[in-house]
Amino acid sequence: MDQFPIMGVPDGGDTAWMLVSSALVLLMTPGLAFFYGGMVRSKSVLNMIMMSISAMGVVTVLWALYGYSIAFGDDVGNIAGNPSQYWGLKGLIGVNAVAADPSTQTAAVNIPLAGTLPATVFVAFQLMFAIITVALISGAVADRLKFGAWLLFAGLWATFVYFPVAHWVFAFDGFAAEHGGWIANKLHAIDFAGGTAVHINAGVAALMLAIVLGKRRGWPATLFRPHNLPFVMLGAALLWFGWYGFNAGSATTANGVAGATFVTTTIATAAAMLGWLLTERVRDGKATTLGAASGIVAGLVAITPSCSSVNVLGALAVGVSAGVLCALAVGLKFKLGFDDSLDVVGVHLVGGLVGTLLVGLLAAPEAPAINGVAGVSKGLFYGGGFAQLERQALGACSVLVYSGIITLILALILKFTIGLRLDAEQESTGIDEAEHAESGYDFAVASGSVLPPRVTVEDSRNGIQERIGQKVEAEPK
């Protein structure tokens, strides 16, 4: 049996790529904050941003204490990793200098590794996934969830839902631990970068939390329009940029797999944006800025699990399917009566399901996740039968059911103990004022565009003199 973590010398190129990828994935959370912040009303923008940013604090602390160990420790009962194995990241941070290499007379330095990477780099990379998964949920509960309840929910959900599910999906045998999770190693469902662990997981959690919390006051009779579409588009652009670290970085090496996933991610995202806009045009007669931004995110979500298993045509199919289906799915909340404020269910749950299941149809024999890989099959459209589709469906359903049940339990516990929701007066005032005693747009009152009723030539001359430090003398009467 190998001793974990394995000690060795990391690959410099892989390490550099993964450090950049980790930073790119972290950038996605501020991008999400802008994306969500622009979609709410002006009196909720700060709270929406705060929910994303605060997830960075809560999840990071828990990840360092026990989260990484639950996600990537040795498997315990097919449920989670050993929480004590890497408690406080023990055994992962440190340098062991050994005797000089006789051939070069230079000191070789062994450090804990995850594959070819320093273990600390892999810890950081996976932390960023945990952060944004929690932050995604916040979009479903805009305008009405107490901030303190959100912080507590974020910690509990990360502990009991995300960390175990990440173990199922991302903990491959012999990488960070000897025995990893069952979806990755026994079921052999393909989820390259988190269609199940991130998007289906967060999407169904958002649905459960929104149902327990209840509808916004006045919804759906009152339409809650985005207050800042430039914020929304800026957020979508940052998400697209950061997603290259998310998908291509999941190769964990600077190689052709990273390159292939970079390309398929780009193609699918572009196709999804066009698919969403076309759907809007046919259905509503207009193609909107919000639709373009939402289509971008839908494409990124759908290609996440499939980016290493499809070719160019497959990426186009994934993107178009996600753009059209997610554009249609966001209307389900009006028919079914649940208030998913910012369409987390329609984009992330539906998009994650689309991308995960399409692997079973479109997995190409030449793709990196299929070619020469044991335990997986080509997609149905390439003559592989239903085997891979069945694996994909079982993996997706397992995450959906587990996350849905545990999230429902956590939400109900919080509702009947500390309470989840603002009161009616606070909701009417606005959650920014009620929870943070701030407003995102206070500066507008003192805008430079507010001028005196009459400005004379003398006023202008005196103003210029004051700016350059000259004494202002009164004009003789």
UniProtKB/Swiss-Prot annotation:
This chain belongs to the protein called Ammonium transporter
Q: Which residues cross the membrane?
A: 16-36, 53-73, 121-141, 150-170, 192-212, 229-249, 257-277, 290-310, 312-332, 344-364, 394-414
Q: Which organism is it from?
A: Mycobacterium tuberculosis (strain ATCC 25618 / H37Rv)
Organism placement in taxonomy: Bacteria, Bacillati, Actinomycetota, Actinomycetes, Mycobacteriales
Q: Which GO terms describe its cellular component?
A: plasma membrane
Q: Where is this region: Disordered?
A: 457-477
Kindly give the SUPFAM superfamilies that the UniProt entry links to this protein.
Answer: Ammonium transporter
Q: What does this protein do?
A: Involved in the uptake of ammonium/ammonia (NH(4)(+)/NH(3)).
Please name the PROSITE patterns in this protein's record. Answer: AMMONIUM_TRANSP
The highest taxon in the source lineage is Bacteria
